[in-house]
UniProtKB/Swiss-Prot annotation:
EC numbers on record: 7.1.2.2
Keyword Nucleotide-binding: yes
Protein name: ATP synthase subunit beta
Gene from which this protein is expressed: atpD
Pfam families: ATP-synt_ab, ATP-synt_ab_N, ATP-synt_VA_C
Amino acid sequence: MNKGRVTQIMGPVVDVKFDGGKLPEIYNALTVKQSNENGASINLTFEVALHLGDDTVRTVAMSSTDGLVRGTEVEDTGKAISVPVGDVTLGRVFNVLGDAIDLDGDVPADVRRDPIHRQAPAFEELSTKVEILETGIKVVDLLAPYIKGGKIGLFGGAGVGKTVLIQELINNIAQEHGGISVFAGVGERTREGNDLYHEMSDSGVIKKTAMVFGQMNEPPGARQRVALTGLTMAEHFRDEQGQDVLLFIDNIFRFTQAGSEVSALLGRMPSAVGYQPTLATEMGQLQERITSTNKGSITSIQAVYVPADDYTDPAPATTFAHLDATTNLERRLTQMGIYPAVDPLASTSRALSPEIVGEEHYEVARQVQQTLQRYKELQDIIAILGMDELSEEDKLVVHRARRIQFFLSQNFHVAEQFTGQKGSYVPVKNTVSGFKEILEGKYDDLPEDAFRLVGSIEEVIENAKKMMA
C-alpha cells in the first residue's frame, strides 16, 4: 500500500509527500485513520487535486481537518471516492463519501460501489426523444413545461421559495408517477434537509428517494463533490435498471461557490468576480453526465441561488447555458401573496412549441403571456392616471390579466401546515382548459379573490359561491 506523510495543512487543503516516488493519480482518495494525542479518532478522506513536484501532492479534505498534524501517515486507496449504488440507497441519507448518516445503521460492506468521477455517456448512446414531464403545477405545465430527461433551473434570490417548489415536485412526482428520486443537498441549511427528510418520511415518499447531503457547515471539498455523489447514484438507476430518475440539486450555486473556495486555496488565479478560472469546465463535467440515454433518463431540477438578484453574475450565467427550461421566481410576486412566485413572462422552456405540447396548449400559453405582458405595459398608465383613463379594451385586458395572475398561484401539499389549505395536483389538460375559459371571458363576473391559491377552475367557482353567499 502506497503511504505518505502530511507536510502542510491550510484549512481544508492538505499537502502530502510520498517518499517512494510513486504518486497517487489525480482524483484518487487518500485516507487517514488514527487517533490524536487526546485519544480522539481522526478518520479523514482527501482527494488529490494537484501534483506539486518534489514527490508532493496537494489534496482537498472531505471533512474537517481539526486535530490533524504534520507528519501524520496517509494511505493511498488507489482509486477515486466511491459510493454505494442500487436499491440499498433508497430511503437512506448519505454524506459525500457514501457513509449512511441516518439512524438505520451502516450500508452492508459487500454492496456495489461506483466511483464518483466518470465520463459522460457517449454521443451515440444519447436519446433524442422529447417528452413532457407533467408536474401538476399549473404555472410550470402551462408556460414553461419540463422535458423528461432535461435540465431545469429554478432561479431566485434568497427566500422566494426555491426549496418549497423542489419539495412539491418531489412529492407530486413520487405520488403521481411513482418514480425514483435522488436529492442532493449541496451547501444548504441543515434545518431544511432535516425538515425535508421528516416530511418525506411522513408522506412515505422517502421509500423511493435516496438523499445525499453536504451542508453549509461542511468544508468546501464536501460541498463541491456531493453533487457528483448524488449523480453517481442516479446514473446507476438509469444505466443498470433502465429507470427514469429525478435528480434534485439544491443548490447548484453552492457547488460553484465551493469550487471557488477550493480554487483559491489551491493557489489558482481567480477570474471574473473572484470565481475560479475553471468554472465553465467544472459545470460542464457535472451537467454533461445528466442526460437521457437509450436505457433511461435523468431529469434534473436544480435550484439556482442568484446572488443579489443579479442574473449576469458568472455563476447563474454559466448554469443558464446548460438548461432546457428555466423557472424564474420573483420577489415582487411573493409580496403580492402569489405562490409559487413564478414569473410567467421570464420563465422559459424549449418544449413550449406546438410540435411538442400541441396546438391548443401553445395558443393558450401564448395568449396568457400576451395578456400579462399588456397588463405590465399598462401598469405605469394606471399608476399615474388611474383605471378610468384606459380604453374599454384595455380595461378588459387588466380585468382578465388579474384573474390569470391569481389563477397561476396554487396551494401546495408541502405547505399545508402553513396555509391550512389542502394541496392540489392539476393535470395539464385541466390547466389548459381552465386558462382557455378565463381568456374567453367565461368567468369575468367572478370576484378576482376567488382565483387565489386554488387548483382547478371548479375550486374557483366554489370559492366565488362562498364569497357571494
